[in-house]
């Protein structure tokens, strides 16, 4: 947690582009929302050509959906949406009209990492001191 899922047409992103997008999303998340690098997950899923639609017409849309711990204010989430959109457009060359980016809130108590319920935003240090040694993380 967080989990970002990037859905794109098969063949539309090279390995290098996926790497840049994954690193960029990770950096945006850490810069704006905080947290621990090792817990930022980015997963790419691909659909076959002809199976993506935009406005009811076959196309090649890209969708980036993120689930983050609830508790960040809207200004942070808006900045994240904007930064991830710019990143995806710059790296992939996709038209803004074919890109959708969303961020959803998940209560920390509804998510686990390494078998441990996540802390609320701002409580990471105490959580890390408690479970960090169990997960092999420095406190």
PLM segments and residue spans:
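A domain-level signal for the structural core that forms small-molecule/cofactor-binding pockets
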Residues: 1-139
């Amino acid at each position: 947690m967080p989990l970002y899922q990037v859905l794109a047409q098969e063949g539309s992103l090279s390995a290098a582009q996926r790497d840049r997008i994954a690193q960029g999303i990770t950096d945006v998340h850490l810069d704006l929302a905080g947290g621990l690098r090792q817990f930022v997950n980015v997963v790419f899923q691909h659909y076959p050509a002809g199976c993506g639609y935009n406005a009811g017409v076959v196309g090649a849309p890209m969708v980036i959906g993120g689930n983050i711990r609830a508790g960040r204010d809207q200004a942070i989430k808006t900045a994240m949406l904007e930064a991830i959109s710019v990143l995806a457009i710059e790296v992939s060359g996709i038209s803004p009209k074919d890109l959708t980016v969303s961020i959803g809130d998940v209560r920390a108590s509804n998510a686990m990492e390494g078998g441990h319920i996540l802390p609320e935003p701002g409580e990471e240090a105490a959580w890390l001191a408690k479970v960090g040694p169990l997960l092999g993380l420095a406190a």
